[in-house]
Amino acid sequence: MKELLNMFNFYKAFKYYKAGKKSLKSKTHIDTQVKIKIEVGKESNRTEILNFLLSQFDKDPLYLEIGVRNPTDNFSKIKSSSKYSVDPGVEFKTNPVDFKMTSDAFFSKLKQNKILSCDMRFDVIFVDGLHLAEQVEKDIANALYFVKDDGFIVLHDCNPPT
């Protein structure tokens, strides 16, 4: 009897094995695996993400980038004719940004109506400035004040150890 039960269990397991093997060879499974591999291999970069968000607005969106360093890395690739850049130019001395100052100084002057307009609100604000926890927190707070209600704040590599 025990031998018969073992044979039955073996037959059942073998039946599942054959069904699994058959499904692994099916066109649907193979096509799905190819699609998964393609999706997993995709890599979006910050410029693509920012330009996608900017494309969601009906009009020319207002864009602000905090922490530009080298404009050819991202800022110059942004598809908006109304864009502003802020960077003190510490790492890239010849940085041709709109506002060569810290983000704290920029937001302070903006609030005081000393640069641009204190009523200005941005559709997309990209925060990629000083990567210290305290500064990222300040940049987010300032960005929240100056982003439109239907706008976006995008953060880049701001998971600092501090």
Sequence positions of predicted segments:
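A short alpha-helical cap/connector motif
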Residues: M1-T162
